[in-house]
A protein has these predicted regions:
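Fe(II)/2-oxoglutarate oxygenase catalytic core
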Residues: 2-127
């Protein structure tokens, strides 16, 4: 595993680490430290099941259930955000095409969450 800053930014990219495999404590500590240092980590080209996604999320820290979430996967810790529709025209996830401004989820908690883990399945080529 390698962790490198993305050129000209505060973002760090974690390379050569298949997240679908168990992560050793040494790599887990390095990932947590990198997150504390920069606040944004990128893991490219991962193909994860929901169980694998949750297992990796637990490497970073215990997940917080988001009470207002209306688009849950089969796991209560995983919420689906999407602007896609199924063949019947029903939304596949929350938010749709609603405009959003920058915000932090659950920052109003007495002890705010540490961060948010986003897993992109279909992404635009830019933007």
């Amino acid at each position: 595993m390698r962790i490198e800053f993305v050129d000209g930014s505060f973002v760090q990219e974690v390379k050569d680490l298949p997240l679908w495999e168990p992560i050793g404590e040494g790599d887990a500590t390095a990932i947590r430290n990198a997150y504390q240092d920069s606040g944004v980590l990128v893991f490219r080209r991962q193909a994860l099941s929901e169980d694998e996604l949750l297992a990796f999320g637990n490497v970073i820290g215990a997940p917080e259930l988001y009470a207002e979430a209306t688009w849950r996967s089969t796991l209560p810790e995983v919420n689906i955000l999407s602007n896609l529709r199924d063949q019947d025209g029903d939304m596949l996830g929350g938010l749709a095409n609603k405009p959003l401004t920058w915000h932090t989820d659950q920052s109003y908690y007495a002890t705010p969450v540490t961060g948010c883990f986003l897993y992109g399945v279909e992404l635009p080529s830019e933007g």
